[in-house]
Amino acid sequence: MGDKKTRYKIPSGVKEEARRGRTLRTMHGYGGGKVTKAINYRLRVQKDVGYGTAVKIDTYYRRHEDVDPKGENFDNRKRPSKGLIMWKMMGGNAGHSWSKKLKKSLDVIQKKERLNKINQTLEEIHGMVR
């Protein structure tokens, strides 16, 4: 499944939603801070993202998936909520679906990392016992 050097191709639907999010942010002047803007830039401009960005995208959606879509003015086209603008900037519903797929890959990488640390510790302990 990969390691921390793996790159994750950004689906076209995610890119399109990220562009819409940027347009909304420009029109209304709110929604998303420095991290959201940086990720939005990557989603719009790059072909793929690295492990660190993939983790941030996954973290965003896990934190916001039950809150933002239910928030006030989420579907208001004239005055959208900050939550909607951020949601779109992070890739919208397409980004949410993509993040669920990314999560599986990220989980494998994190489990491999933990297993490697355990094995390293066991080897160190084994070396002390000799």
Each language-model region and where it sits:
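Arg/Lys-rich, low-complexity, intrinsically disordered basic segments
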Residues: 1-130
